[in-house]
Swiss-Prot record:
It comes from Archaeoglobus fulgidus (strain ATCC 49558 / DSM 4304 / JCM 9628 / NBRC 100126 / VC-16). It comes from the Archaea. Belongs to the UPF0165 family. Gene3D superfamilies: AF2212/PG0164-like (4.10.1150.10). Coiled coil: none annotated. Possibly the antitoxin component of a type II toxin-antitoxin (TA) system. Its cognate toxin is VapC7 (Potential). The lineage of its organism: Archaea, Methanobacteriati, Methanobacteriota, Archaeoglobi, Archaeoglobales. Pfam families: AF2212-like. This is Putative antitoxin VapB7.
Length: 65
């Protein structure tokens, strides 16, 4: 069954941010996706920081206009 986990890429290695139930040396497929911030910032031509701030405001019910 497919499972989605978050990982960080450091020194050429993907490191999972949570425990994974895999045997040592087991092969998996990794699908890379842009974060919402990266994809929206590229479309809107605004900084990642401004997009992050707007998403935080929306999450907390603040008016972004």
């Amino acid at each position: 069954m497919p499972k989605v986990i978050e990982a960080v890429y450091e020194n050429g290695v993907f490191k999972p941010l949570q425990k994974v139930d895999l045997k040592e040396g087991e092969k998996v497929k990794v699908e890379l996706k842009e974060s919402v911030v990266e994809s929206v910032a590229g479309i809107l031509k605004v900084s990642d920081e401004k997009v992050k701030k707007a998403l935080e405001m929306i999450e907390y019910g603040e008016d972004i206009y």
